[in-house]
UniProtKB/Swiss-Prot annotation:
GO terms for cellular component: plasma membrane. Keywords: Cell membrane, Membrane, Transmembrane, Transmembrane helix. This is UPF0756 membrane protein Dred_1097. It is a multi-pass membrane protein. InterPro entries: UPF0756_TM. The lineage of its organism: Bacteria, Bacillati, Bacillota, Clostridia, Eubacteriales. The keyword Transmembrane helix applies. It comes from Desulforamulus reducens (strain ATCC BAA-1160 / DSM 100696 / MI-1). The chain crosses the membrane at residues 6-26, 52-72, 75-95, 111-131.
């Protein structure tokens, strides 16, 4: 059995044991694609999968805004509340960190392996959700920046 198949089966098993349907499903889909020799689709997924995933994530978050039953005055009040202002700051910092992570991944793409392993550890042991490598890369960029400050 090829090494990639063993790794994918391991991911499926880890997803099952950790009760992470996302990890198990992703492993299953990749294994089926691999066994079906859908290399072109895998290449497309590798190149554009993150963008497509982020589009669906953004859509799921923005759906409430598309409903007609939103009271915009309440929306503004919530946004200007202390929690809303913290959410604005959090969103601003998160997108900045994601941008820094993307720069880091372009400079040193080999770091993705450590981020994937770290994500798996977070899923299995901390009950985390694999939202994408950009946040992991952004945090890595922040950690590296802090280390450089102390050198």
């Amino acid at each position: 059995m090829q090494r990639a198949n063993i790794i994918l089966l391991s991911l499926i098993l880890m997803g099952y044991l950790a009760e992470s349907a996302l990890l198990a499903t992703a492993g299953c889909i990749l294994l089926v694609m691999r066994l079906s020799k859908l290399n072109r689709l895998m290449f497309l997924l590798e190149r554009r999968g993150l963008e497509v995933g982020l589009i669906f994530l953004m859509l799921s978050v923005l759906v409430p805004l598309a409903h007609d039953n939103i009271v915009y005055k309440e929306l503004v009040m919530k946004t200007l509340s202390p929690q809303g202002l913290l959410a604005l700051i959090g969103g601003t910092l998160a997108t900045h960190m994601n941008g820094e992570g993307l720069k880091l991944l372009k400079l040193d793409p080999q770091l993705i392996f450590g981020m994937v392993i770290g994500s798996l550890i977070g899923i299995v042991f901390l009950g985390g959700i694999p939202i994408g490598p950009l946040m992991a890369a952004g945090l890595t960029a922040l950690f590296l920046e802090v280390i450089y400050w102390f050198k």
